[in-house]
Amino acid sequence: MEQVVIVDAIRTPMGRSKGGAFRNVRAEDLSAHLMRSLLARNPALEAAALDDIYWGCVQQTLEQGFNIARNAALLAEVPHSVPAVTVNRLCGSSMQALHDAARMIMTGDAQACLVGGVEHMGHVPMSHGVDFHPGLSRNVAKAAGMMGLTAEMLARMHGISREMQDAFAARSHARAWAATQSAAFKNEIIPTGGHDADGVLKQFNYDEVIRPETTVEALATLRPAFDPVNGTVTAGTSSALSDGAAAMLVMSESRAHELGLKPRARVRSMAVVGCDPSIMGYGPVPASKLALKKAGLSASDIGVFEMNEAFAAQILPCIKDLGLMEQIDEKINLNGGAIALGHPLGCSGARISTTLLNLMERKDVQFGLATMCIGLGQGIATVFERV
């Protein structure tokens, strides 16, 4: 079986969905920009030699509809002979795109693929056109389709207080801002055209979603967003709404060496699981455990983790049940997470994996794990190994 390697990984800055940098930039353009950039950064690989493009996107309608992967590839002037498919596993879409490409390479059906994902939540809101089947209520609580209420449920089940959530959210912003100030994101962010507050076209090379002024005291003043009477989850402890894209160049190790390209990491194992939709945010726990089992590793073998911060109330129970509460500041989301950077649904899996690869290199660790919860009760995880 072929070894699957990540040759390169990049992303756009994360733009605010409400009147942000990419308010006049379409999702296809964000995607095409990264496709062109990956190919330009790795000229040894001819675009025509790509076997496929796998691109995650959740709301596949309006500008994100009709197979955005193919639309973006055409905009990027990728040769018409290269196919492209849009992947949807909700929040885990672009990580699923990576898994799909990896399996093609493992079986010998592909040698080189572009993978990634995008979501423009300013142009195509998360709830646009959603119409749940009324019969679902026979098997699943109606509230299971409301992500904020599933986070409230997890917080109550695991004893996660409002104070713990506020502290974690403040940490996310502080760490993301520190990473920005220290240029820790420089190797992953590709400058991307957008418009400033005055409408002037400019190149953005930083995440505009981060709020460096965030404090625990300020967060404590916010009202509950989903359960106004008994709730603890606020807008400040939820992932921000943002627009962005991320992309990776994935190859067989043999093809990468043949072309003189240096792999950054191997895909050591992959896992996806289902869980109770009412606690959808718990999915990273069984997914991570399964991925670790497949890799023959334990949580203690992992040097750094990237865990998508859908909600502070959601990630803290996952950290607790993976036995990592005492290692948060040494191993988990060291450059902040989605609470500060936002969670553009189809982008986030590739985004956290890209950040993870850079952290693995900076911290000089052998193994890293990226994991995410998924709406309606799933979890997905990937273990990476430095080459």
Curated annotation (Swiss-Prot):
**Which residues are responsible for catalysis?**
C91 (acyl-thioester intermediate), H343 (proton acceptor), C373 (proton acceptor)
Q: Which SUPFAM superfamilies match?
A: Thiolase-like
Q: What class of enzyme is it?
A: transferase
Q: List localization entries.
A: Cytoplasm
The EC number of this protein is 2.3.1.16
Main site of residence? cytoplasm
Complex formation: Heterotetramer of two alpha chains (FadB) and two beta chains (FadA).
- HAMAP family, per database record: FadA
Recorded protein name is 3-ketoacyl-CoA thiolase
